[in-house]
Curated annotation (Swiss-Prot):
Part of the 50S ribosomal subunit. This is Large ribosomal subunit protein uL16. GO terms for cellular component: cytosolic large ribosomal subunit. It comes from Parvibaculum lavamentivorans (strain DS-1 / DSM 13023 / NCIMB 13966). One of its GO terms (molecular function) is structural constituent of ribosome. PROSITE patterns: RIBOSOMAL_L16_1 (PS00586), RIBOSOMAL_L16_2 (PS00701). Binds 23S rRNA and is also seen to make contacts with the A and possibly P site tRNAs.
Amino acid sequence: MLQPKRTKFRKAHKGRIHGKAKGGMHLDFGAFGLKAQEPARITARQIEAARRAITRHMKRAGRVWIRIFPDVPVSSKPTEVRMGKGKGAPEYWAARVKPGRIMFEIDGVPLAVAEEAMRLGAAKLPIKTRFVARPGEQA
């Protein structure tokens, strides 16, 4: 699973995800992509599950690019522990995703295969997504 090799700080504030994506909104590598329609924190496990679903449907033909990286540590306290006594230990890593962000890109497969692969990958994610294609491709 994806996670940073090292970080400046061990724990992060929760924060809120405001506004729309200001970068990573266009297809840069592949001919087809999966674009986020809602803001959310996508966990490393969800990214990996979506990647597996996409590559499995493509039967390892073509290429997949993951355009988001889980760089935010999400902490949680153990179950049945009273409030207070500090912040919990980092539990997993997540990526903050804003609406309009391209999360996955694929190339080297026909349109029908790409659409179905992205549909299967989107089912593993907790947000609404949209399939996008380059203007040159038959969308």
